[in-house]
Design a protein with these regions (language model features):
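Active-site-adjacent structural segments surrounding the nucleophilic cysteine of cysteine proteases
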Residues: 1-48, 55, 63-69
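Acidic helix-start/capping segments at beta-turn-to-alpha-helix junctions
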Residues: 47-51, 65-84
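Sec/Tat-exported extracytoplasmic proteins
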Residues: 54-61, 111, 140
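Conserved active-site-adjacent core of cysteine acyl-enzyme catalytic domains
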Residues: 79-133, 143
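Hydrophobic beta-strand signal
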Residues: 135-138, 164
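Extended serine/threonine-enriched, polar tracts that run as long, contiguous segments within proteins
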Residues: 141-147, 162
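Short beta-strand-centered aromatic/proline hotspots
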Residues: 145-156
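Short solvent-exposed strand/turn elements
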Residues: 158-179
Length: 179
């Protein structure tokens, strides 16, 4: 994976902790919108969204980032340098850092939904934080929305759906719940 031993995508001078996790949450709330990644020319599929935001935040704040690549399982980090990127210009601002964007594109090309379950660095889903009985509210507007109910959390990498949801719909009636 790392073809050369010199150079880094970026130098991490900070470390993840609870304070940085709170700052990440706040940054997402302030910056993540439907057009953010498009405005910055970042191609995505569904899993790429989670990876891209985490890596962008890490790059901005000089935090480490690491994920396992699909297929090989190799660890790809902010210190993983490929020979093709050595001469690629960097910049202070992440959106102008061509080396970072090349590395991000490589990461997004080599990860997918199944790598997320055991690879949400550094925070994994834990039963203490998300468990049966939790609710998810999707409020479309002041008048309409959708509620989903967490039935079970299965933290087993062989299980295809780690979070099991129960949901109903409108109109109100006696029905089998969607699972």
């Amino acid at each position: 994976l790392t073809e050369v031993r010199t150079g880094k995508i970026w130098n991490a001078t900070n470390s993840w902790n609870e304070s940085w996790e709170r700052k990440y949450k706040e940054w997402i709330e302030e910056n993540a919108d439907a057009s953010f990644l498009k405005r910055h020319g970042i191609a995505t599929d569904c899993a790429d969204v989670a990876y891209a935001y985490r890596w962008i935040f890490a790059r901005i704040h000089k935090l480490p980032a690491a994920n396992r690549l699909g297929g090989s399982g190799a660890l790809f980090t902010n210190e993983s340098m490929r020979s093709a990127w050595q001469g690629v210009p960097t910049a202070q601002e992440w959106q102008n850092d061509r080396r970072f964007k090349a590395a991000l594109n490589y990461l997004l090309d080599n990860t997918f939904t199944h790598t997320l379950m055991g690879d949400i660095y550094p925070v994994a889903i834990q039963p203490a934080h998300l468990s049966a009985g939790a609710i998810y509210l999707d409020l479309y507007s002041d008048e309409t929305g959708h509620t989903e109910f967490v039935r079970r959390v299965i933290l087993d990498s062989t299980h295809p759906q780690p979070i099991r949801i129960l949901a109903s719909t409108v109109p109100r009636e006696v029905r089998e719940l969607e699972e």
